[in-house]
Amino acid sequence: MDAYVALEGGHVVEARGRSPGTSRGELVFTTAYTGYEESLTDPSYEEQVLTFSYPLIGNYGVREERFESDRVHPRAVVARELTDDVAEWLADEGVPAVDHIDTRDLVTDIREGGAMKCGIAVGDDATAEDALAELDACKGMSEHEDIGAQVSVAEPVVHEGDDDGAYADADVALIDCGAKGSIVDSLVARGADVHVLPYDATEADVDAVDPDLLFISNGPGDPANFEAAEALVDTYVGETPIAGICLGQQVVARALGGTTEKMDFGHRGVNQPVRDLETNRVVMTTQNHGYTVGDPGDALDVTQVNVNDDTPEGLDSDELGVITRQYHPEANPGPNDSLDFFDDVLGLTESRTTVAPADD
């Protein structure tokens, strides 16, 4: 099949088509060399075109038990070489895919110019003009104002905790902004009953759970577009312990007076080093985000930073009962160095705080 990738600025790259269709999205890359099944089913890649920097994708097949959600989320996939297994899977999912492209050059372009819009056209009759038409119709990530609706549950779902878990009496209200399955699994394995609520859940929805912990999940896009989750943090902070991962950290920071900003090309991979400012310990982490906390505000302490660029990786408040992480402690894919995060946040449920944040 013919295939064309149109990059922001109008440059068109020819490739080999592996899965037919036309699509568009923000072109990003991951440096992960394993875990392609988990990456492709991660809801945080919604409305993006995912480029794999590792040259061969698919060399250990496709197994559903590794999926992080029930579908592929990137709008299209770019690789140096895709195996037939992955190409067929993407075709079944209706996701265009191309390979035989110089991904090293493409990744360099993204690193130097930042994440960019792109359009893709794949098919026996595909043309460069088709890809350019997709590029012209492409929106920026911040313009997807209701992206949460594309990745969230529509109705509450309850996952019962393991009876022998250490926190078998805990109820967690997890606001699903695009949650990975492994986050839910990590909480359930520790005994917590996880009540997954829609991204636009109301105070009444949360009150119906009467949670011991409010958890804001990961998700795609601009945290400014998750105003309902931000409002929940503002309502419950100081009354109910709060945790967040990835987008969840950004939402919590915004609710407590902080700011967020778009990164040039983000952090996406399984080898991002993070340093704990108290212990000076460095752990390797899995990350997938294009936005970060700029100014964390006065209510939260920066407890961990990225070794490469000093961006905030951990924001905590002992007084308010808040623990958030920009990276993915649940990994999948990636290292398991930070699984104790789930014990730390569930530990907050043993003595619920009642301290209110100070007024600005």
Question: Which stretches of residues belong to each language-model region?
Answer:
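RNA-binding accessory domains that recognize and position tRNA/RNA substrates
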Residues: 1-171, 177-184, 188-189, 198-200, ...
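Active-site glycine-centered loops adjacent to acidic/histidine catalytic or metal-binding residues
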Residues: 10, 102, 246, 289, ...
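Short acidic loop-to-helix transition motifs that present clustered carboxylates
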Residues: 197-204, 222
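Cysteine-nucleophile active-site neighborhood
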Residues: 208, 213-290, 334-342, 348-352
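A glycine-centered loop/beta-turn motif at secondary-structure junctions
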Residues: 315-357
